[in-house]
Regions:
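Short, flexible, solvent-exposed loop/turn segments with mixed acidic/basic and small polar residues
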Residues: 4, 169-170, 415-419
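Hydrophobic helical h-region of N-terminal Sec-dependent signal peptides
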Residues: 6-16
Length: 592
C-alpha cells in the first residue's frame, strides 16, 4: 500500500473544515511555513484515500547543553542546537482512527519525527519542503495503521467501544521571546567545581555532577485552529554519589537543583553545601546498622512525603487505556489502582488533592510544573482530583476514557499507540487538620509505647527520582516484585531512622517499602503544619530515573508530613558485589 501513496497523492488527500485562520507574526517563517502547508492541504481533495481529519505540526527550536564532571574533572561536554519537528496525521474520525491498537506502535502509526532534516537557518522554502515530506510519510503510516486496525476490529468483539480522540477547543497564543543562548563555558566551570567536593570523602566510590540545560522556542499548530509560539527554558543540576558498606551493600544519595523559565539556579555556595550533605549522608550510612523488617507506625517528613505521595498519587491518578490487540494476543499492561473508584474514599476526609499547572508561584516558590499547553495542544486547567478524601476526577489527555467528556490538558509524556500520557504538573496535597511536626513525632512515640514496640520509623528522604542506573533499577524492581506483599514497587527510602521511646533517633540502612499501594493512604492518621515543595523532572523511566532520555515533564509537588498508622518495610534483598579489598587512592583535596 505504501508504494501507491505518493507525496503528490497526500497533498491532494487532506480535506477538513477549519476555523478562520488567525493573523501571524509578520517575521516568523516557521509559523508561516506551517500555516501555508496546512492551508494548501486544506484546499485540496482526492477520492479513493482515507481522509485525514486531524493534522498537527510541532517544532522545538532548541539549544541544549549537557556536562558531566567528577572529582573536579570534566567527563562529558555536549552543546548542540537542533530544530526538532514532529508531524502527526490522524485518518478516519474522532470516533475511529489509526491509533490505540497494538500494530500502531509507539507513535500511533501517524507520527513522523525528522530531527536531522530541518535547517538551522531560516528558509521558508526549506521549511515547507520538510513539512510536506514529513507529512507525506506520516500520512502513509497512518493509512497503513488504520487499515490494520479495521482488520483487527473485524475479528474482535469490542463490548464497550470508546472514541479514539477527544475534541478540543482551539487555543491561540503568541508569546514574545527568542532562543536564549546557553553559556556552556560558565557551566563547565561551575559543574567541575561542585564535583571536587567528593575528593574529601575517600569512602565514596563513585560520584558525579551532571548539568542539563535546555533553551527552546516552541511552535505548535493543528488543523483545529490552535497555534502557539512560546519560549521555554529548564536547567537541572544533579549531584549523586554511591558507595558500599563493609558488607557490600550498595548505598546511594543524590540532590537535584532546578531552575525554570530563566529563574536562577542555586548559587555555587549552596550547590557545594548540597554536595557536602550528600557525601555526609553516605558517610553516615556506611557506619549505620542494617534495618530490620518492620510493621507499624511510620512518620514521613514533608520532603519525603512530597516524594512518596507525588509518586503514589501521580502513578494512579490517571487511567491508562489498553490498546486493541486482537483475539489471542496479550498486552503487558499496568492499570491504575484508582480505576473504578470515582466517588470512593481514597484518603482521610481532611485531605484534598488538586493539580494546577496554571499557577506559576505559590508562597514564594516558583512552580516548575507550569505549562501553556500539553503535548496534545490542549490548554491545561486546574483539576480537583480528591475532595474531602473522595476521588472526583482523573487527569486526562485527549485519549478518551470512560465517563469523562474531554481532556484536562495533562497529556505531557508519550504513552505509545498514538496517545500521550497524562501526568501531574503542580500537585497540591492539602490538609485541613494539622499538627506541628514535633507533635507528630511525639504522637509516633506514644503509639509505639501503647503497642509495646521497641521503636517506630521516621523517613526523611527517598531516592526519587532514582539515582540508580537502569540495570540496578531493573534488579531492584524485580526483587521487590518477587518478595511479594502486593502493591506496586515504590522508590527506595534513602534516609530512615529508628525512633525510640526516649526520642532518640538512629539511622539505619537497607530498608525498602513492602506492600505499598494506594490503599495504604487510608492509614494516614495525621499531617504536619509544615509543608515542603519537591521539584523534579518526570520522564518515562522507572521511578523518574535521573538522566532518562525522552520527553520531560517538569513537576512540583507540595505536601505536608504524614503519620501512617501502619506501613511495612523490609530488608533489601538485591545481591551485591563484595567491597573493594584494596583501599582507595589518596586524592588531592582542592577547595571548591
Amino acid at each position: 500500500m505504501k508504494s501507491t501513496l505518493t507525496a503528490f497523492a497526500l497533498a491532494l488527500a487532506v480535506a477538513f473544515a477549519q476555523p478562520a485562520p488567525k493573523p501571524l507574526p509578520g517575521d516568523d517563517l516557521v509559523l508561516r511555513a506551517m500555516r501555508e502547508e496546512m492551508e494548501r492541504s486544506r484546499q485540496l481533495r482526492q477520492t479513493g484515500l482515507e481522509m485525514p481529519y486531524f493534522l498537527e505540526y510541532k517544532l522545538e527550536d532548541q539549544e541544549s547543553c549537557s556536562i558531566g564532571a567528577s572529582l573536579g574533572g570534566l567527563l562529558t561536554v555536549r552543546q548542540i542546537h537542533l530544530r526538532m519537528p514532529m508531524v502527526q496525521v490522524r485518518v478516519g474520525s474522532y470516533d475511529l482512527d489509526n491509533t490505540n491498537h497494538l500494530a500502531a506502535g509507539y507513535g500511533g502509526g501517524g507520527v513522523r519525527y525528522d530531527q536531522d532534516t530541518w535547517p538551522l537557518d531560516d528558509s521558508l522554502q526549506a521549511f515547507r519542503q520538510n513539512l510536506w515530506l514529513a507529512t507525506d510519510r506520516a500520512y502513509k503510516s497512518a493509512v497503513e495503521a488504520f487499515s490494520i486496525k479495521k482488520e483487527i476490529l473485524k475479528q474482535t468483539n469490542v463490548t464497550d467501544p470508546l472514541p479514539d480522540f477527544y475534541r478540543a477547543q482551539p487555543f491561540v497564543k503568541i508569546v514574545p521571546g527568542k532562543l536564549v543562548p546557553i553559556n556552556g563555558e560558565t557551566w563547565k566551570t561551575r559543574t567541575a567545581r561542585v564535583s571536587t567536593v567528593f575528593a574529601a570523602y575517600p569512602e565514596i566510590m563513585t560520584s558525579g555532577v551532571e548539568l542539563e540545560a535546555l533553551s527552546s522556542l516552541s511552535y505548535y499548530m493543528n488543523s483545529e485552529g490552535s497555534m502557539l509560539r512560546y519560549p521555554d527554558a529548564l536547567t537541572s543540576l544533579r549531584i549523586r554519589a554511591a558507595t558500599q558498606a563493609p558488607d557490600g551493600m550498595t548505598l546511594r544519595d543524590s540532590a537535584l537543583h532546578i531552575s525554570f523559565q530563566g529563574s536562577n539556579i542555586a548559587a555555587d555556595a549552596d550547590l557545594i553545601r548540597s554536595a557536602e550533605q550528600v557525601a555526609n549522608n553516605l558517610r553516615a550510612l556506611v557506619k549505620a546498622p542494617v534495618g530490620e523488617t518492620y510493621s507499624g507506625p511510620v512518620l514521613i517528613e514533608p520532603m519525603a512525603s512530597a516524594q512518596f505521595l507525588g509518586y503514589l498519587l501521580g502513578e494512579n491518578i490517571r487511567i491508562p487505556r489498553k490498546p486493541l490487540a486482537g483475539p489471542g494476543r496479550s498486552v503487558p499492561f499496568a492499570s491504575s489502582e484508582f480505576e473504578g473508584k470515582i466517588g470512593s474514599r481514597v484518603l482521610p476526609e481532611w485531605l484534598d488533592v488538586v493539580d494546577d499547572p496554571t499557577q506559576t508561584e505559590f508562597r514564594g516558590h516558583t512552580l516548575i510544573g507550569h505549562y501553556l499547553i500539553d503535548n496534545d495542544g490542549v490548554q491545561p486547567r486546574p483539576v480537583s482530583l480528591i475532595e474531602n478524601g473522595v476521588l472526583k476526577e482523573y487527569l486526562r489527555s485527549r485519549q478518551p476514557i470512560k465517563g469523562f467528556p474531554d481532556s484536562t490538558g495533562h497529556g505531557r509524556l508519550l504513552a505509545g499507540f498514538g496517545a500521550n500520557q497524562p501526568v501531574i504538573g503542580n500537585l497540591f496535597i492539602r490538609a485541613r487538620q494539622t499538627k506541628k511536626l514535633d507533635a507528630l513525632k511525639q504522637q509516633l512515640i506514644s503509639m509505639i509505647q501503647q503497642r509495646n514496640k521497641p521503636y517506630g520509623i521516621l523517613i526523611r528522604k527517598l531516592d526519587y527520582p532514582s539515582s540508580a542506573s537502569m540495570g540496578e533499577l531493573q534488579a531492584i524492581i524485580t526483587s521487590m516484585v518477587q518478595s511479594g506483599g502486593g502493591g506496586r514497587p515504590a522508590p527506595l527510602p534513602a534516609l530512615v531512622y529508628k525512633i525510640y521511646p526516649d526520642g532518640r533517633e538512629e539511622l539505619v540502612r537497607g530498608l525498602r517499602f513492602r506492600g505499598v499501594s494506594t490503599r495504604s493512604l487510608r492509614d494516614i492518621m495525621a499531617a504536619s503544619e509544615e509543608t515542603a515543595f519537591f521539584d523534579f523532572v518526570n520522564n518515562s523511566g522507572p521511578f523518574a530515573m535521573m538522566g532518562s532520555a525522552g520527553y520531560l515533564a517538569a513537576t512540583t509537588v507540595m505536601a505536608p508530613g504524614v503519620l501512617f498508622e501502619e506501613l511495612e518495610l523490609e530488608r533489601s534483598q538485591e545481591e551485591s558485589s563484595k567491597a573493594p579489598i584494596v583501599p582507595p587512592p589518596v586524592l588531592t583535596v582542592r577547595k571548591p
